[in-house]
Structures are given as C-alpha cells and as structure tokens.
Amino acid sequence: LQICPMLLNLLLLLFLAGVCTACPKECECDVSPTTNETVSAYCGKGGLDDSKLTVLLHSLPSGIRSLEISTPSWRPANSFRWNDNLNRFSSLRQLRLIGCGMPSLSRPRLPNLELLDVSNNRIDHATMANFAGFPALKVLDLSNNKLSVLPTGVFAYLKKLTSLSLANNSITEASSNILRGLENLRTLRLDRNRIPVGHLNDLISDVRSLEELGMGGCHVNPLSNLSLDRLPELRSIDLSSNNLKRVPSAELAALPRLTSLSLAFNRIDEIEPCAFCGNNLTKLDLSHNKLGLRGKILKEEAFDGTSLTHLDLGFNHIENFDSTTIGVAQRTLKSLSLSGNYLTTFDAASTRTLHALTSLHLAHNMISDFPLVFPPEYYQLKVLNLSSNQLYYLPDNLGSLLGNLKEFDLSHNRLKSLSTASAEFIDTIDQVYLAGNPWDCNCGLQQLQEHMRQRFALRRQLEYGATRCSTPEILKGQAILSAVAVNDCAVLFGARYGLSQSGELLVLLGALLIAGALLVVLLLLLYYGRERQYKGSYVTRECSRTPLTMTLPPHGITGISCSTSSSSTSDPSEVNNLSPPLPPPPPKAMSALYFGV
C-alpha cells in the first residue's frame, strides 16, 4: 500500500519534467543543466501562419527566456501577425521575430524583455503604445521594414534603451524630438534612409552621449553639412555608400575619440598622407572602393597618427599587396582583410612585416591550392577565412602549419571529403565553417558528424543547416548532421584522394590486372630469348669440334655442314686436301688365317 503513493509521486515528477522540457517539433530547444527546464527555443523550419503560431506558442513552456522564430532562405517563409499569446512568457528576456511578414506590433506586455528584434518584416508604422509594454527594453531592432514616418515621442517609454536600429527603412521625415529622453542610448543605426540632413542634425542633438552612429547610404555628401561636432563621445561611425571620392579628413578631425571608421562602398581610389591624423583609429574599413585602379594603393604616411589593429581592404582592385605599404600600421595590425581581390596564392609579401597579425581574411579570391609551406606569419594566426575560393582538398600537414588556429572558414569551396589527418586537425579548432561545399557522404560521415555534435550549441552560427550532402543521390540535399551514414569508406589510400571504398577497390583491381599483364609479357620475352640463345650455342658447339672428336656419320648419312655460303662454292678437291687422311681399315679375317694366325 505504501508503494502506490511512491509510484504516483514518481509518475508526477516524470510528467512535470516532461512539461518543463517540452519542445515543439518545429523548434530546437536548449535545456538548463541545473533545473532541467527549457530556457531557449529556436523555431526555424518555416511555414508558420497565425493558427500554427498559436499552437506553437501554447506548446512552449511559459518559463522560457529566449525565443527566436525565423527561417533560412531555403525553407518556406513565415507569414503571421503579432500574437498576444506571446504575453504569457513573462520571463522572456530576448525575442526575435525575424522575417515573419508582420505588419505591426500590436500592444505587447513583456515586462522583463531586454532585446526585441523584429527586423525584415513589413511593419509600416509605429506608435507609443507599441512600446509601452517594454519597460526593461535595452536593444530594439526595427531594421529592414517599411517605416516611413516616426511620430513624436514614439520611443518615450524606452528609458533604458541603449541600442536602436532603424536601418533600411523608408524614413523621409523624423520629428525633432523622437529621441529626446533616451539618455542611455549609445548606438543608433540610420543607414539607408532618406532623412534630410537638417533632420539628422536635430536627431543627433538629442543624444549627445552617442558612441556609435550608422549613416551608411544616407546621402550625406558633402559630409561638412552634418554636425558631427555635436557628438563629442562618438567612437564609431559608418559612412559607407555615401558616394565619397576622398577621405573626409577635415570633418573627421572633429571627432577626437573616434576609433572605428567605415568608408566602404564609396569611390575612393587613393589614400592621401596623414588622411586620418587627429583620430586615434584602431579599426578602418576601406572595402568596396577603387583602390588599386590608379597603381599604388596607399601613399607613404597614409596611416600616420593611427594605431590600427583592424584593416579591411577587401573587394578593391589589389592583385599584389605588400605589407610594407601600410607604414606605421605594420607594428600594430592584428586583423587584415584582402577578400575579393583576385588573389591566387598565399603571397608571403602580403604578411611578411605583420608580426602581430592574428586574423587574416582571404575570402572570395581565386585560391585553389595550399602551399607546401605557409609564410611564417601564418603560424600565429587564430582566424583564417578562406571561404568562397576554389579549394578542393586539405593537406595532411595543415596542423603543423596552422597550429594556433581557433576559427577556420572553409565554406563555399569545392571540398568533397576530409582525410583522416585533416579531420583530426579540424577537431582541434573551436569554430569551423564547412557549409556550401559539395560533400560526399559515402565515407567519413561519422567523424564529421561527431565534430558537429561537439559544437551543437554553435550550429546556427556555423550554418550546420547549410552543410549538406551532395553525393550519393540517396542523401543529396540532406544536412550532414542528421544524415544516415553510408559505410563506403576507403581502407588504404583512397581517403587521401577523395575515393570511396568501391573506387579504391576498382583502382586496386585495375593495378593488379595491369601488373599481371606486364608480368606475362616479361615471361614470354624471357622464354623466347632463352630459346634462341640455346639454339645458337648448340650450332656453335657442333662446328667447333676437332677431327679427333668428331665421329664419322653412318654410311649414307651426310654430316653436319658448318661451311659458309662462300665456302660451299669452292673446289671439293681443296676441301679434301685440307682434311687429314682417314686411317686404313683393319685386315680381313681370311688373310690372318693364311699366315697361320
């Protein structure tokens, strides 16, 4: 009788544990190791509408702290409106509803929410009521929507807001006080909006504590019209896609605390000497410009007055880069990007003086082979990006050449398989990007799957969903992480050359057949050679016999003739004269009797 209550309690505990860890089939959930409760959920299978979203939200435990609903490009898109069932997640700290087709935000009530990301939707208006239910909100991302007008006081309730992104909308008009009262705001992104310069100056006047400002694609050319001197604390500014033809040195001089600058996607074709004097720049982005079209990329003393640690020269017109051209930055540079610059090799000149380099980006080039030996600076690298090249194999000695690597991007190359040595090297690296390669899942799948399982928490960052099988046909298009292994592994040498077990056996069989055929031909040649040699030596012995050793042939049988064709025409009498006389025949028996013998 006492056992029954114990069993009931056990069943109740199991039921509660199942409820706490319940995860819908559309999602992937992370469970707390201490409380065994679901703390976060990522729902990325797509195809959600209003009714499916309601069912999904009811199936999630109410105590989750992080929820993301988004979908990769290859899956069906989501399309739903804001659902008030989200209000049941009172402990929610982070909410991401990305690319879900939402037209508005309704009136949510999430008192503990700190991050809200509703980017890539169809939100075309916003009011104070939309944000009144987020008193603890610190990060708000409204980028890539259809906002055109922001009314007065729209963000008045977000007193704790530190980061706001309005990038990639259609904002053409902004009230002068929409940012007033946001004393904690440190990051503001206004990229690719057609806001008049006068309105921009009014906006930034209300947030003088701003440290990061995004103005990419805002058509603020000339930059002198923008009152940057109103932001004395500014440390990072994005001026990309503003049709700039030169570095705005004079305007940047008004920002003494500036450490990060992006001039990407402009029309700059050269960097003048002392172009960044007056700033303490450590990070500079010059990608997607016209550097290299006019010969020399950089002029001497171009980076004087800086302490650069990160330099991006990607997607210019640089075919040969010499690290000595960056002047004083050689001593401090830790990260260099030469992506998209028509490079074909790992040129030693590009890194030979960069002794502090730890991160190198060579993506989107035309590199197809690894060298036998890397330049010595490569051994100290911790990050190496080789994505979108033409690499088709990894050498077995890569571990001895890149011994300190922590992040390795090999995505979007032509890799089909990994040898045992290269797979062991991959296992020593914390983050490896392998998506977008035509993987052959006939062999070596278990080792690659085990590598991914060990880094399952980083599956979205490392794009494991896009790391898919290309062959065999039965597994084509399946994610490697969930594919069923096919045991077709090479045993001897095939893994080194990307051969399957059947391919390796065919090569071995062909080699055996060729070796057998060559052996038969060799034996036949030896046999016929020995036979001809034996016949020749026999005739020579017969001709070299002396008269004493030669026995007479029987009567009526002609002996062996060793004479040449020329001697056969000579006189027979001459031959007889040269031959010794034959011994006389023995006496007859009758004559012996006559003499009384």
PLM-predicted stretches and their roles:
Residues L7-V597:
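Extracellular leucine-rich repeat
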